[in-house]
UniProtKB/Swiss-Prot annotation:
GO biological process: fusion of virus membrane with host endosome membrane; signal transduction; symbiont entry into host cell; symbiont-mediated suppression of host innate immune response; symbiont-mediated suppression of host TRAF-mediated signal transduction; virion attachment to host cell
Pfam families: Hanta_Gc_C, Hanta_Gc_N, Hanta_Gn-B, Hanta_Gn-H, ITAM_Cys-rich
Region named Binding to the ribonucleoprotein: 526-543, 598-615, 602-613, 621-635, 1131-1143, 1131-1148
Record GO cellular component, one term: host cell mitochondrion
Motif YxxL, residue numbers: 625-628
Protein name: Envelopment polyprotein
ZnF locations on chain (CCHC-type): 555-575, 580-601
Alphabetized InterPro entries for the sequence: Envelope_glycoprot_Hantavirus, Gc_C_bunya, Gn-B_hanta, Hanta_Gc_N, Hanta_Gn-H, ITAM_motif_hantavir-typ
Family from the record: Belongs to the hantavirus envelope glycoprotein family.
Record flagged with keyword Disulfide bond: yes
Gene source species: Puumala virus (strain Bank vole/Russia/CG1820/1984)
ITAM domain location: 621-644
Length: 1148
């Protein structure tokens, strides 16, 4: 057994894996969609799921069980008596008996079922108050299998208490997931949040509300009253279909319906609610429901045995119910209640479609559940902008987006958005991760483009790091870190400035000493090289002179070329006697012997050394080397002078490096004032402007004949607005394509009502009375009888988007000019101009991707953007075309289901229908090729019955603008502007720093004139960081200016030209714990007033303001810096003491 234990363990593990695989296959999801704001009295939330089929033998043992934490109502869990009504072929028929109307029979028996949707009176009505949830199921069966549909209804408060739990029905597990949508209180339809308000259609004009198609789930409730016919529901159906004379249908009850995913209960019938009348009429037309079968049975076949009657209950002496017996895929619900009995008699009829035609009087039933659709008026929830912030995390950033009314659309080209949602009250929050911070983070949220500057994230990390380093002095840690952590050259300049101020008295002599040592070594190497080279040149000159006067310098014996006369004389004396002229050792008096000895002789350089000693020794103490050696780098005067020069230099670099680069769109920091233009010629501007950008142009126009006469000129172009005259085509629908085969052996094709005949869109082809044996099963009667009915229909209709057709287009900009005291405004179209006596502003043309006759499709809120269709069918639409299925105010428009039927036959086999046309809806085709369509984004949309206006936030459109100002201006009249402007700073929020931004609130007073168009800037003492154009009116005006930039010492003032408010306000320091973005719409402003760039005086003014700001700010920072300066001076004094005998030590 010990040897077999590993095998047993292996088999056990395999069995567990197989069990887990089977469990996973039996897991189904039931999604409950909840609004994310739950208030009292908002009704019920409902959901359903269709489960896989199970053998009919298991139905009687089914039990719906729950492991959820909510309180389940027990009324549906008890056993209930049903009459099981089935059909079968008669057992006494001979083997080859052909099928006929008498070849089958029905049987009735009593069974007990539990958990079906038999909802007692007041259970649904009190569910919200009692905090009880209702779980039940319904059955759609043929002769062998049943397909359950599980329904879950509960008070909407369960969306708060439950996130996920499990239900079980037989061997099937149902994962119940409560998902909060981005809707505050409405249902999610077409990607938008829709609040159905049925009274709007009665009290308001049609253009003030929207109409949506929503699903309706209805459940039969039994309620008996002692007298009257008020609860006899069948009477209402008979009245609706104008059937008179029926007196036997005494069943009493009503349907309670839930609309969409959450709603208050709707009672059917109810005289005071037109929604109830609409549902009642749909029930009368489609008595079994408007949803015909499950999606996986979209292409299936059924065989009709014939009409049957039976006894319900089984103890009846005569038939009380009728229907159509079939085999094949199950269709509608197989449960119902008999209408002819006072007391409810429940029927379970597998394989039989029970009679539901209300135009007959007898043997009718009502289904226990009914599913359909209803069109309702209502309003679409307003959306708000998103707030996004990010924090640095590892190599990337952690970001979070939230909105007060939900996030319906969020995407980013640089981040991974995982759709993990949280809700705090009405706010919806989504967290996501951005893996890279080497580029700015762009997020599209609720139709707005948000940009987070990643350099601000790095600044935040820098602040955190420096704060940790200086944590021993927490009073100055953050203030010092904020000053140091500035991006780019500006930050390095700040750090060098502080290092120079604090440690300059130590760093300057240290760095100077190191540089001097390097220079001295280099000078010495250069001088040494010069000495050797000069000596070699001297020897060469001596050699040449000797050769000229005395002859050859070559020894005749050893053939060695000598360099001096003494060396040649020694060779002549020694070589001839066989002695070495250098070391005087004996050798042979031959050339080879002597040359071999010279190679090893150690005294060969004796004569060169003697010559070198006879020359004057070189003293490298003159010129550069001597100057460097005697440089007094430890002098207090030198160190102090360099320290002051470096401080001034660093302040200039610090101020100059604070300027931002010029941008096409956005603010460029400039000095105060505006540019002056002498009007010697006409002033002409010709440029291209992005559709999402506004443009401000401001100048002082000067009289060339008199420089004192100046006219203020202000031009303001607002963002481009697209005006589209539209035709509302309706709502585009998606649907499931169904192909059904209905075969019966005898009777004409008109004998039966086929399931697809109650669908909104269908076509049918009948193959009646077969003429051969090739299309008949073996039990059919043969040639000349029977029918194969082929049907194609569309169901499971779902509204997916709004559709508008562009009738005409206009592109406009509002143009305003202020020339002296004259102000003119006009909304200018393409190829239109604003013309005054002196100024002409023209919008010459627009580059656009929109054209009249284009069709716009919105798959969600307008702010989410849409798709442009160049071809959209409006009259003759085929299934699969864009716009194939449309829901319009006049009703449903069905497409042409083009294609031909073909009956597939085989000998002794039931025929099957085939369809060779398109089977994919236009919406599904569009989704598969969505990237091939042009898309567009929308900001600030405004829609009415026949018009749609919006701004393009992507700058995909451009306008050609031309501006001409005539030089013939009336300077005498226009230069004298009586308007007086006084400015005061009210408040400020936000932070200084180029990546954070601030909002300055100004109070501007206008006197002496009624209106004046001008620009108000946000400036400190040196520069301006933002501007806004304001049309001032007489009196007090509140102006908001958004700016970015500045430093810790900036006192932001409200300025007009060179006049500023008397006081300024200091913005907060950029803590940058959570970096928020700026709206791209706020940044798409082009401002050009020609103000001069910051020069030398501006730099000193900026540096001085910063120093004063530091002094007036956290005094502990200044104290610490001064202490460090004193310590560095003391250290310098100790390391570099003054030497009074310096001159004596260096006396020559």
């Amino acid at each position: 057994m010990g040897e077999l234990s590993p095998v047993c363990l292996y088999l056990l593990l395999q069995g567990l894996l197989l069990c887990n695989t089977g469990a996973a296959r039996n897991l189904n999801e039931l999604k409950m969609e909840c609004p994310h704001t739950i208030r009292l009295g908002q009704g019920l939330v409902v959901g359903s799921v269709e489960l896989p089929s199970l053998p009919i033998q298991q139905v009687e043992t089914l039990k719906l069980e729950s492991s959820c934490n909510f309180d389940l109502h027990t009324s549906t869990a008890g056993q209930q008596s049903f009459t099981k009504w089935t059909w079968e072929i008669k057992g006494d028929l001979a083997e080859n008996t052909q099928a006929s109307s008498t070849s089958f029979q029905t049987k009735s028996s009593e069974v007990n079922l539990r958990g079906l949707c038999l909802i007692p009176t007041l259970v649904v009505e009190t569910a919200a108050r009692m905090r009880k949830t209702i779980a039940c199921y319904d059955l759609s069966c043929n002769q062998t299998v049943c397909q359950p549909t599980v329904y879950l209804m509960g008070p909407i408060q369960t969306c708060i208490t439950t996130k996920s739990c499990l239900l079980s029905l037989g061997d099937q597990r149902i994962q119940v997931n409560y998902e909060k949508t981005y809707c505050v209180s409405g249902d999610l339809v077409e990607g938008i949040c829709f609040n159905p308000i049925h009274t709007m259609a009665l009290s308001q004009p049609s253009h003030t509300y929207d109409i949506m198609t929503m699903m309706v789930r209805c459940f039969l409730v039994i309620k008996k009253v002692t007298s009257g016919d008020s609860m006899k529901i069948e009477k209402n159906f008979e009245t609706l279909v104008q059937k008179n004379g029926c007196t036997a249908n005494n069943f009493q009850g009503y349907y309670i319906c839930l609309i969409g995913s959450s709603s208050e209960p709707l009672y059917v019938p109810a005289l005071d609610d037109y929604r109830s009348a609409e549902v009642l009429s749909r029930m009368a037309f489609a008595p079994h429901g408007e949803d015909h079968d499950i999606e996986k049975n979209a292409v299936s076949a059924m065989r009709i045995a014939g009409k049957v009657t039976g006894k319900v209950p089984s103890t009846e002496s005569s038939d009380t119910v009728q229907g159509i017996a079939f085999s094949g895929s199950p269709l509608y619900t197989s449960t119902g209640v008999l209408t002819s009995k006072d007391d409810p008699v429940y029927i379970w009829a597998p394989g039989i479609i029970m009679e539901g035609n209300h135009s007959i009087c007898e043997k009718k039933t009502l289904p226990l559940t009914w599913t359909g659709f209803i069109s309702l008026p209502g309003e679409i929830e307003k959306t708000t902008q998103c707030t996004v912030f990010c924090t640095l995390a590892g190599p990337g950033a952690d970001c979070e987006a939230y909105s007060e009314t939900g996030i319906f659309n969020i995407s980013s080209p640089t981040c991974l958005i995982n759709r993990v949602q949280r809700f705090r009250g009405s706010e919806q929050q989504i967290k996501f991760v951005c893996q890279r911070v080497d580029m700015d983070i762009t997020v599209y949220c609720n139709g707005m483009k948000k940009v987070i500057l990643t350099k601000t994230l790095v600044i935040g990390q820098c602040i955190y790091t420096f704060t940790s380093i200086f944590s021993l002095i927490p009073g100055v840690a953050h203030s010092l870190a904020v000053e140091l952590c500035v991006p780019g050259l500006h930050g390095w300049a700040t750090m060098l400035l502080l290092l120079t101020f604090c440690f300059g008295w130590v760093l300057i002599p240290t760095i100077t000493m190191i540089l001097l040592k390097i220079l001295i070594a280099f000078a010495y190497l250069c001088s040494k090289y010069n000495t050797d080279s000069k000596f070699r040149i001297l020897i060469e000159k001596v050699k040449r002179e000797y050769q000229k006067t005395m002859g050859s310098m070559v020894c005749e014996v050893c053939q060695y070329e000598c360099e001096t006369a003494k060396e040649l004389e020694s060779h002549r004396k020694s070589c001839s006697i066989g002695s070495c002229p250098y070391c005087l050792n004996p050798s042979e008096a031959t050339t080879s012997a002597l040359q071999a000895h010279f190679k090893v002789c150690k005294l060969r350089s004796r004569f060169q050394e003697n010559l070198r000693k006879s020359l004057t020794v070189y003293e490298p103490m003159q010129g550069c080397y001597r100057t460097l050696s005697l440089f007094r780098y430890r002098s207090r005067f030198f160190v102090g002078l360099v320290w002051c020069v470096l401080l001034v230099h660093h302040l200039i670099v610090w101020a100059a490096s604070a300027e931002t680069q010029n941008l096409n769109a956005g603010w460029t920091d400039t000095a105060h004032g505006s540019r002056i233009i002498p009007m010697k010629t006409d002033l002409e501007l010709d440029f291209s402007l992005q559709s999402s950008a506004s443009y401000t142009y401001r100048r002082q126009l000067q009289n060339p004949a008199n420089e004192q006469e100046k006219i203020p000129f202000h031009l303001q172009l607002s963002k481009q607005v697209i005006h589209a005259e539209i035709q509302h085509l309706g709502h585009w629908m998606d649907a499931t394509f169904n192909l059904k085969t209905a075969f019966h052996c005898y009777g004409s094709c008109e004998k039966y009502a086929y399931p697809w005949q109650t669908a909104g869109c269908f076509i049918e082809k009948d193959y009646e009375y077969e003429t051969g044996w090739g299309c008949n099963p073996p039990d059919c009667p043969g040639v000349g009888t029977g029918c194969t009915a082929c049907g194609v229909y569309l169901d499971k209709l779902k509204s997916v988007g709004k559709v508008f057709k562009i009738v005409s287009l206009r592109y406009t900009r509002k143009v305003c000019i202020q020339l002296g005291t004259e102000q003119t405004c006009k909304t200018v179209d393409s190829n239109d101009c604003l013309i005054t006596t002196s100024v002409k502003v023209c919008l010459i043309g627009t580059i656009s991707k929109f054209q009249p006759s284009d069709t716009l499709l919105f798959l969600g809120p307008l702010q989410q953007g849409g798709l442009i269709f160049k071809q959209w069918c409006t009259t003759t639409c085929q299934f699969g075309d864009p716009g194939d299925i449309m829901s319009t105010p006049t009703g449903m428009k069905c497409p042409e289901l083009n294609g031909s039927f073909r009956k597939k036959c085989a000998f002794a086999t039931t025929p099957v229908c085939q369809f060779d046309g398109n089977t994919i809806s236009g919406y599904k085709r569009m989704i598969a090729t969505k990237d091939s369509f042009q898309s567009f984004n929308v900001t600030e949309p405004h829609i009415s019955t026949s018009a749609l206006e919006w701004i393009d936030p992507d700058s995909s459109l451009r306008d050609h603008i031309n501006v001409i100002v005539s030089r013939d201006l009336s300077f005498q009249d226009l230069s004298e502007t009586p308007c007086q402007i006084d400015l005061a700073t009210a408040s400020i929020d936000g932070a200084w720093g180029s990546g954070v931004g601030f909002n300055l609130v100004c109070t501007v007073s206008l006197t002496e004139c009624s209106a004046f168009l001008t620009s108000i800037k946000a400036c400190d003492a040196a520069m301006c960081y933002g501007s806004t154009t304001a049309n001032l009116v007489r009196g007090q005006n509140t102006i908001h200016i958004v700016g970015k930039g500045g430093h810790s010492g900036s006192k932001f003032m409200c300025c007009h030209d060179t006049k500023c408010s008397s006081t300024g306000l200091v913005a907060a320091a950029p803590h940058l714990d959570r970096v928020t973005p700026y709206n791209q719409a706020d940044s798409d402003k082009i401002f050009d007033d020609g103000a001069p760039e910051c020069g030398m005086s501006c730099w000193f003014k900026k540096s001085g303001e910063w120093i004063l700001g530091v002094l007036n700010g956290n005094w502990m920072v200044v104290a610490v810096l001064v202490v460090l300066l004193i310590l560095s001076i003391l250290l310098f004094t100790l390391c570099c003491p003054r030497r009074p005998s310096y001159r004596k030590e260096h006396k020559p």
